[in-house]
Structures are given as C-alpha cells and as structure tokens.
C-alpha cells in the first residue's frame, strides 16, 4: 500500500468500484517474479494513474483473517494532479482526504490511526532488493 500525502490536500485514497465500495490506500498484490517496489508502482498507477517513487517502509499489518500481510510504504507522486479515470476497472474515485471517510477499509483505518504526521523526503529503496525466487 502507498501513503501519498499532499501537505495541503491530505492523504490519497481510492474508492472501490465493486464489493463494499470502501475507501482504501492505493495498492494491491505482488505478482510472481515481481519486486515489492515494482508491484506497488504498478498498482498505484493502475488505480490512480499516478507515477510514484517509493520511499521507506512505514508500517506492517498482519491480516491473518485474510492470510495476507499489508505493507505500507511512503510514496511521492511525479505530479500532484490526479489523471482522468476512464481506464480504471476496479476503482470508482480517487481523491485526497484530510480526514478518514466513514466507509474506509480495515487497513486504511489501521494505518490512518497509526500515522505520526506527514511523510517528508522519505529515502527510496532499490527495486531489485525484494524479489521472489524464480519458479
């Protein structure tokens, strides 16, 4: 998951198009052979249209109820403006929020409550350092 924060506008959240239609932090699953950083860049672009640089790891959430682990990374977009949404299949809306909406995902609620303040100048990590072994 990506924590993308604009000092004036708040934190970037995406609203799911289907299911419970919850507000969530951008992110998704890592494909086999894909690094964490590449997966997050791909997911953020697919969901928001933004290109981002990935910074430091901010938090970890063990989702044992879903057999998953959520990792939260700082991310800095190449542009503050959000591109159009005509090609997004899974996401209905993308917008910055100063407070957490009522219909937020469990992961968004957890990371929002655990935040310590705005993320500034987070160091980047190499994309090649976190890869699955070849199958």
Task: Give a label for each model feature.
Residues 13-16, 74:
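Short, acidic/hydrophobic/Gly-rich beta-strand patch recurrent on exposed beta strands
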């Amino acid at each position: 998951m990506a924590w993308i924060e604009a000092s004036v506008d708040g934190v970037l959240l995406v609203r799911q198009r289907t299911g419970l239609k919850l507000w969530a932090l951008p992110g998704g699953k890592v494909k086999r052979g894909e690094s964490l950083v590449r997966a997050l860049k791909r997911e953020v672009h697919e969901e928001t249209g933004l290109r981002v640089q990935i910074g430091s790891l901010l938090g970890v959430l063990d989702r044992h109820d879903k057999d998953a682990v959520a990792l939260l990374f700082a991310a800095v977009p190449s542009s503050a403006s959000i591109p159009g949404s005509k090609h997004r299949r899974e996401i209905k809306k993308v917008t910055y929020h100063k407070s957490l909406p009522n219909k937020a995902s469990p992961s968004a609620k957890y990371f929002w409550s655990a935040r310590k303040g705005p993320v500034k100048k987070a160091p980047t990590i190499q994309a090649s350092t976190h890869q699955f072994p070849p199958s």
